[in-house]
Design a protein with these regions (language model features):
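Glycine-rich, aromatic-lined ligand/substrate-binding cores of catalytic
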Residues: 198, 209-216, 221-224, 229, ...
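Short acidic low-complexity segments
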Residues: 38-39, 68-79
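C-terminal capping/lid region of NAD(P)-dependent oxidoreductase domains
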Residues: 159-163, 366-381
Length: 381
C-alpha cells in the first residue's frame, strides 16, 4: 500500500461553502489516512486555500494545521496542485476556470458553473479539448431523504410517474435587525445572484434523475424584498429575483412543479421537500427523511376530508427506514471525483451536466421575459 498525494486549490475558502463543506470534508479524508483506492493505495488531499482577505485566510489556515494559503490566484495556478475547486461568487467564475484550464488544472466546481448556458458549455468544451477531467458538485441526491427517493424511483415503486413537485425555501432576513443568512452577492445580478440561477441547478439534476428529463419550462419570478443590508451594514437595492415558480414538462409525459422562495415561512417537514406521485404509489422526501404511501394504503380522502375529523391524511404515510450511516454529501462528491482522477472511475456530473443546470435557469428567465413555454433542448459537447 502506498500513499499518494494530490494538491487541491480551494478558491473561496473563507466563504461558508468553502470552509464548512469543501475544506472540512477534504481535511476529514486526509485525517482518516486518505481515500482508499482499488489497488490498496490511499489518496491524501493536500489543500491550498485561496481568498481575497489575507487576515481571514491566515486565521483559517492556522486553525486547521497551518494549511497553505495565498490571496493570489496566479500564484495558486503556478503551484503543482492538480485540482481547482471554485466556490467563490458565480459572476466571475468563467474567467477563473479558464485560467485554471490554461494552467492545466483538473476542474471541479460549485454550481452554477457560469452565469449563462453559453458560457457554461464553453467551459465544458475548453476543459474537454485540454484533456482535463472536469465535474460539478451535485450534492442533494446524496442526502439521506433524497437518496431514499432515488432508490424508490429506480426500484419501480411509483409505477408510471404522473407528477413531481418541489416545494423549497425559507425566510431570509434582510439584514436590518437580524443577519442575512445568504451573502449579498446572491441578490445582485452582476455578481451572479438570483434564486433561479442558484437553485434551478439543483432542480435540474434532481428531477432528471428522480423522475424524467425536463423537456419544457414555463416560469414566473419576483423580487419580494427589494432592499437589503449587506455584510458591512450598508443598504443596497436588490435587482435579482428571490422567488421562482415553474411548471415543467417531462420526457416521460409527467408534469413537474417548482415553488421556490427566499421569502416564505415554511410549514412542512423540511425547508426542501420533493413529492413524486405515480400510479402505484407516492413518496415525499425532505433532506433527511422520506415517506411513502402505496396504492393499497391510499385512503378515500375526497369526501371524508370534507368532514371535520373525517380522515387523517398523514396516517397512511410510512417512513422509509435508514439502511446505515450516511456520509456528508459533499464528502461523497469529493470521494467520487478524487477516484475519477486517481483511477479513472466514472464521474457522471461533468461540466456538461453543470451546463444543463444553467440552461434550465436561462430558459426560465426567458420564459418570464417572453411569457411563454420554452423548449429544453439536449446539450452535448
Amino acid at each position: 500500500m502506498a500513499e499518494r498525494r494530490m494538491g487541491v486549490i480551494i478558491n473561496g475558502a473563507t466563504g461558508r461553502m468553502g470552509t464548512t463543506q469543501h475544506m472540512a470534508n477534504l481535511l476529514a479524508i486526509a485525517a482518516e489516512g486518505g481515500l482508499p483506492l482499488e489497488n490498496g493505495d490511499r489518496l491524501i488531499p493536500e489543500l491550498l486555500l485561496v481568498g481575497r482577505d489575507a487576515g481571514k485566510l491566515k486565521a483559517l489556515a492556522a486553525a486547521h494545521s497551518n494549511q497553505r494559503w495565498t490571496t493570489s490566484l496566479d500564484e495558486a495556478f503556478a503551484a503543482p496542485d492538480r485540482v481547482f475547486m471554485d466556490c467563490a461568487a458565480t459572476g466571475d467564475r468563467p474567467r477563473r476556470v479558464k485560467q485554471a484550464i490554461a494552467a492545466g488544472k483538473h476542474i471541479f466546481i460549485e454550481k452554477p458553473t457560469a452565469p449563462t448556458v453559453d458560457e457554461a458549455m464553453a467551459l465544458a468544451r475548453l476543459a474537454d479539448r485540454a484533456g482535463l477531467k472536469h465535474g460539478v458538485i451535485q450534492d442533494k441526491l446524496f442526502l439521506p431523504g433524497f437518496a431514499k427517493l432515488l432508490s424508490l424511483s429506480q426500484s419501480g415503486f411509483f409505477g408510471r410517474i404522473l407528477s413531481v413537485r418541489v416545494d423549497a425555501g425559507s425566510w431570509i432576513f434582510d439584514g436590518t435587525d437580524r443577519e442575512c443568512q445568504r451573502p449579498s452577492w446572491n441578490y445582485k445580478k452582476a455578481e451572479g445572484g438570483g434564486l433561479a440561477l442558484d437553485m434551478m441547478a439543483h432542480w435540474r439534476y434532481m428531477i432528471d434523475r428522480l423522475a424524467s428529463p425536463i423537456i419544457g419550462v414555463c416560469a414566473l419570478m419576483s423580487t419580494a424584498i427589494p432592499q437589503r443590508v449587506d455584510e458591512q451594514g450598508k443598504p443596497y437595492a436588490v435587482d435579482a429575483e428571490d422567488t421562482n415558480y415553474a411548471l415543467l414538462k417531462l420526457e416521460n409525459g409527467a408534469v413537474g412543479m417548482i415553488t421556490n422562495s427566499w421569502a416564505t415561512r415554511p410549514r412542512r417537514d423540511d425547508t426542501m421537500v420533493v413529492q413524486i406521485d405515480g400510479t402505484l404509489g407516492s413518496a415525499a422526501a425532505g433532506r433527511f427523511r422520506c415517506y411513502t404511501q402505496s396504492a393499497a394504503e391510499t385512503p378515500e380522502a375526497f369526501t371524508a376530508a370534507a368532514r371535520p375529523g373525517g380522515v387523517d391524511l398523514m396516517a397512511p404515510w410510512r417512513e422509509v427506514p435508514d439502511t446505515g450511516p450516511h456520509k456528508n454529501p459533499f464528502r461523497q462528491c469529493w470521494e467520487a471525483f478524487l477516484r475519477h482522477l486517481a483511477e479513472d472511475a466514472p464521474y457522471l456530473p461533468t461540466l456538461v451536466e453543470g451546463a444543463k443546470a444553467v440552461q434550465l435557469a436561462d430558459l426560465a428567465y426567458r420564459s418570464v421575459a417572453e411569457q411563454k413555454w420554452m423548449e429544453v433542448a439536449d446539450l452535448r459537447l
